[in-house]
């Protein structure tokens, strides 16, 4: 069976995702499409708008054959680690092709750039460190400057969010298994971070979340496939954002010692001091980010760091594993064919997982479900089985 892998968040699953999924199957001639999906919290350092099980239902209803959870210790980190670990899982499942959307739209350029960076890794790292000498330069900007020095201005614009992820997927493939082929399609109609819906049927997940959180589900439904609309209408819990977790974060920052925060993943250069000061002044999470940010720290990096503090995530990340959230008959057939040759631990029943393997994931789910009206999902990692569909 020919397998295509995709890396997703489906926060929520919308028409743009449906287009991407259909193209992934069509252009790669895949027998099975496997999605590695973020769980309770996502890469920008935010809570997912609805629980991972509801989003897995959306994926399966739309035609994904297998949904595998990207562990929270990787799903909530910067693009390098996010991509490396997603590719590690997909490689372990033996995909043939990695398919992604990008602003650039030419897979060969991603592969070329990744090969050159691997071949010139020492020089590339040196250029990054040189750019970081300026204390006001963020790591993302330093990375972009080093990339431009190596390739010039025209090969890839890695300031674009999907291009940078695509580049890191290509880099991970080159380092882990260059036999995996890459395919990409140009992202159309809506930019990744666009906050307003401006196209008849396609809008960014950011714009769709904004509508849903404002109580405009019917308006948001113009940009969602019917299966996603049904799941959202039947969902009985709250639609979530940082607003729901602000008081928990504020408490953590106020009660924790500076030394304790220094041991949290992503905390460096004294950022915990700014965060602790901001926590005593901010009225809400948006205020907190405004009070904390500097030229060196992007909003996304601050959100990720705040999330690691909320989750009490220690510097050492968990080991990778394959956690099945759901699959259809095709996905089940594929898993049964390859199960013996998969090198990572496969988790379908959490209570039977190796001790400690899912510790960070379980804690993240418990914190995610502290919000009212999520009682049905509390300890869900234990009592909600993988979704199996026909």
From Swiss-Prot:
ATP binds at residues 7-20, 101, 162, 187. Keywords: ATP-binding, Cytoplasm, Ligase, Nucleotide-binding, RNA-binding, tRNA processing, tRNA-binding. It catalyses: cytidine(34) in elongator tRNA(Met) + acetate + ATP = N(4)-acetylcytidine(34) in elongator tRNA(Met) + AMP + diphosphate. InterPro entries: Rossmann-like_a/b/a_fold (IPR014729), tRNA(Met)_cyd_acetate_ligase (IPR008513). One of its GO terms (biological process) is tRNA modification. Gene3D superfamilies: HUPs. It comes from the Bacteria. Its main location: cytoplasm. GO terms for cellular component: cytoplasm. Its EC number is 6.3.4.-. Catalyzes the formation of N(4)-acetylcytidine (ac(4)C) at the wobble position of elongator tRNA(Met), using acetate and ATP as substrates. First activates an acetate ion to form acetyladenylate (Ac-AMP) and then transfers the acetyl group to tRNA to form ac(4)C34. This is tRNA(Met) cytidine acetate ligase. It comes from Listeria monocytogenes serovar 1/2a (strain ATCC BAA-679 / EGD-e). The gene is tmcAL.
